[in-house]
From Swiss-Prot:
Protein EC: 2.3.1.117
Keyword Cytoplasm: yes
UniProt KW keywords: Acyltransferase, Amino-acid biosynthesis, Cytoplasm, Diaminopimelate biosynthesis, Lysine biosynthesis, Repeat, Transferase
Source organism (scientific name): Rickettsia rickettsii (strain Sheila Smith)
Protein name as it appears in the record: 2,3,4,5-tetrahydropyridine-2,6-dicarboxylate N-succinyltransferase
Recorded name of the encoding gene: dapD
Taxonomic classification: Bacteria, Pseudomonadati, Pseudomonadota, Alphaproteobacteria, Rickettsiales
Amino acid sequence: MSSLIKEVEEAWQIKDKLLQDSSKLITLKQTLNDSIESLNQGTVRVCEKKENSWHVNEWVKKAILLYFITTESQLYNNNYNSWYDKVAPKFSADTDKNTFKEAAIRTVPGAIVRTGAYIAKNVVIMPSFINIGAYIDEGTMIDTWATIGSCAQIGKNCHISGGTGIGGVLEPLHAKPVIIEDNCFIGARSEIAEGVIVEEGAVISMGVFIGSSTKIVYRDTGEIIYGRIPAYSVVVPGVLPAKETGKPGLYCVVIVKQVDKTTRAKVRINDLLR
């Protein structure tokens, strides 16, 4: 792995000249293909948790960006669609039954996953879009018309409901993608973007929009935080009233309660939201 990282880092330093050096390009393409395949298999990932903190592996982002720079678009076809892209689909008309059985995943028509996205066992993918660099851990459901952005990280046993947008990011290199930790529920038509972290066991109601500058308000105390939904929080959309009379209130999201891990396991999602 160290040699792979070294080659990517060296290529990044001369990225603007790569297309002018055909011999260097041939060697580099194999390195980049190996990097994308490592993402595909989940042996490397863009972002990972170390010592209770999430860290970005910038070299992986560089590998993805270099792959875009050095790869020409080509025509792809399946049984009902054609498209022209630099990134091959993870699954195509040529993917056989045994591949799906060995991966222990289920997909339905309209599920689009780009190569370089990792899909763990027992994941169900409804008609949706999962971009390169994304990581979907075991037992998660990606529901209908959800969008998982490039490099977004989704934990184990999550439910990403219909029409939800999970933001991704390739640049700037140091920026974290959206991270949804284990056992989270993201309600339908919600949008989580700009590197927000939703910690383990959190429940996000339907139609909640959270970016890096969205005020996250504890209902009980009035405390305001940004960029992070604490573990086992139950979150709904809300409005912060204006201090000045006659001025409009501003959108926020509200932590209406926090439950412990045991309660979260026992109580149905709908009961928590009510």
